[in-house]
């Protein structure tokens, strides 16, 4: 813990919107300083354990967990006598897909209970940057649901 505080990465030096989005999703029920501290501790943990740039691993993690372009939504088609349920495929914007990837990474880190959250967040970011982990499994589950919906159209 002492090494993490001594070698603290200052998030203010990185003017990246991805970090701001991570802080925004971590801030629920907390103060902003706690969310910034949690993210900086997890980035320091990444820098100490894998000896790579933590910002680039964060970007790779989000890139690997971004879901596909399409989303299945039900829509109603009404004729003269009948109402039919029809599946529509809607394209998501890149911003929404990035938000979904960040939510999946944070959700996968919060599901683990044995250690502190910054360690779980760091490990999940590293796993997602290696294209494995729970966040990538969430993405694969969503892709499988989309394929099943396309088959049943």
UniProtKB/Swiss-Prot annotation:
Belongs to the universal ribosomal protein uS7 family. One of its GO terms (biological process) is translation. It holds the Pfam family Ribosomal_S7. One of the primary rRNA binding proteins, it binds directly to 16S rRNA where it nucleates assembly of the head domain of the 30S subunit. SUPFAM superfamilies: Ribosomal protein S7. This is Small ribosomal subunit protein uS7c. The lineage of its organism: Eukaryota, Viridiplantae, Chlorophyta, core chlorophytes, Trebouxiophyceae. GO terms for molecular function: rRNA binding. It is found in: Plastid.
């Amino acid at each position: 813990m002492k090494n993490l505080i001594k070698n603290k990465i200052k998030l203010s030096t990185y003017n990246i919107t991805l970090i701001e989005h991570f802080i925004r999703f971590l801030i629920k029920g907390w103060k902003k300083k706690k969310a910034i501290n949690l993210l900086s501790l997890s980035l320091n943990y990444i820098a100490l354990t894998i000896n790579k740039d933590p910002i680039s691993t964060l970007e790779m993690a989000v890139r690997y967990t971004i879901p596909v372009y399409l989303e299945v939504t039900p829509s109603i088609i009404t004729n003269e006598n009948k109402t039919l349920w029809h599946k529509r495929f809607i394209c998501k914007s890149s911003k929404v897909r990035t938000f979904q990837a960040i939510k999946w990474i944070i959700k996968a880190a919060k599901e683990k209970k044995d250690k502190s959250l910054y360690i779980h967040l760091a490990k999940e970011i590293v796993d997602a940057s290696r294209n494995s982990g729970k966040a990538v499994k969430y993405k694969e589950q969503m892709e499988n649901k989309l394929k099943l919906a396309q088959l049943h159209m």
